[in-house]
Amino acid sequence: MIKNGTRLKSQVCDTQVIVVRSTDALDDLRCGGEPMVTLDTEKSPHADMDPALAGGSAMGKRYVDDSGAEVLVTKAGAGTLSIGGIPLSLKEAKPLPASD
């Protein structure tokens, strides 16, 4: 299982993330359809972006899945973050309480 705080990069674009909340599902974390790798791992020369998963990722945004896994994008890129073939959802910010 990937640990909290692990930094990963895409093999097909510039996307980089930090794992905020890890679950077993993150073992299949992908970007652009290809598995994400640690920052010190070489990118595969055979990795190609899946056009169906080329929606991009926004810097500074958190992405989550149904299992509770959460990643923070530290460098934006063209690939869509997914677990397997299922795209992650953008985490919505909680509204602040009124300060009357």
Show which residues each predicted segment covers.
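Short, solvent-exposed interaction modules
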Residues: M36-I83, P87-K91, P97
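A cross-kingdom feature marking solvent-exposed beta-strand/loop segments within repeated
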Residues: M1-I2, A47
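Short, charged, intrinsically disordered terminal tails
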Residues: N4, A93-D100
